[in-house]
Amino acid sequence: MTARRPTRFAKGELNVYRAPRDVTDVTRALRSTGRRVVLVPTMGALHEGHLTLIRAAKRVQGAVVVVSIFVNPLQFGAGEDLDAYPRTLDDDLAALRAEGVEIAFTPTVGDMYPYGTRTSVHPGPLGDDLEGASRPGHFAGVLTVVCKLLHIVRPDRAFFGEKDYQQLVLIRQMVTDLNIDTRIVGVPTVREADGLALSSRNRYLDEVEREQAGALSAALLAGMYAASNGAAATLDAARAVLDEVPAIEVDYLQVRDPMLGPVPHEGAARLLVAARLGQTRLLDNIAVDIGASDGIDGHPRVGSPDHQLPWRN
């Protein structure tokens, strides 16, 4: 039986691997030289939001950044067109080269699930709430693929955007509950000039819908300003903005604690919205401070002279 050749890695270049074993071998070798392996999981169709995650990952001292590009079929449910999801691998790899990324992991479905989908990670009760109520099985698919990526790459840290906030909370829950030795880093949402959260789905909006979509971020800001008056006032203010755009079909608008438990009487919380505009489903969220005259952890409250808005509408 012949020995397996070491997988090639060229420092300072973009190295593209499809086989999970190749990525495992290369990252293990890099760790042995003192490099810190960090992971940015994506489904491709890269935009400025993804690039912001990559830049945050590159700031880790001694980091070698692994970006995975994999359209995961497990997280698509009935009525969600997996085949229609944008696949722009050549453009994505060009963007990674421009950012100085050294490893791209681009497996096929067969590479990731060679024995089918016989084992999965169950997200628990939170997986059936909020997004999970509208997309049964979605978070089991997300956690399964993220768990596999963390075991394949063995990163010191993995970076995820706060736009998909429930996903971020569930991944942190999984890493804690399954004793996975990776630090999960949340990165603030990247937005367009009018506040719309960057998303691969935004390309499906027509010109009129794109203008209307700005109401989601406007609603979040209205809720954030009203939060000193309590959770009900937060929701009322946000809902009033959304009601001005009848084309927006709201799925949910809720205030929860930062771990998505019941809303606190006072203190740090999260305002979350999901809505459909035409054929496009949009998500957004923002941190709010419920019912307190001072800001969270001593920061100025929204509306105070010292407060800086996260974006302008």
From Swiss-Prot:
Active site: residue positions: H50 (proton donor)
Q: Write out the residues that bind ATP.
A: 43-50, 161-164, 190, 198-201
| Localization in the cell | Cytoplasm
Q: Which EC main class describes this enzyme? A: ligase
Q: Which UniProt keywords apply?
A: ATP-binding, Cytoplasm, Ligase, Nucleotide-binding, Pantothenate biosynthesis
Q: Might you give the EC number(s) for this enzyme?
A: 6.3.2.1
| Protein origin, superkingdom | Bacteria
Any single biological process term in GO = pantothenate biosynthetic process
Annotated pathway? Cofactor biosynthesis; (R)-pantothenate biosynthesis; (R)-pantothenate from (R)-pantoate and beta-alanine: step 1/1
The catalytic activity, as recorded, is: (R)-pantoate + beta-alanine + ATP = (R)-pantothenate + AMP + diphosphate + H(+)
GO CC terms, sorted: cytosol
> What cystine linkages occur within this chain?
none
Signal peptide boundaries: none
Q: Where does beta-alanine bind?
A: Q75
Looking at the keywords, is Ligase present? yes
Pfam families from the entry?
Pantoate_ligase
Where do the annotations place (R)-pantoate binding? Q75, Q167
Q: Which Gene3D superfamilies match?
A: HUPs, Pantoate-beta-alanine ligase, C-terminal domain
What GO MF annotations does this protein's record show?
ATP binding; pantoate-beta-alanine ligase activity
Task performed by this protein: Catalyzes the condensation of pantoate with beta-alanine in an ATP-dependent reaction via a pantoyl-adenylate intermediate.
UniProt record similarity statement: Belongs to the pantothenate synthetase family.
- Tell me how this protein assembles: Homodimer.
Any further remarks?
The reaction proceeds by a bi uni uni bi ping pong mechanism.
This chain belongs to which protein, by name? Pantothenate synthetase
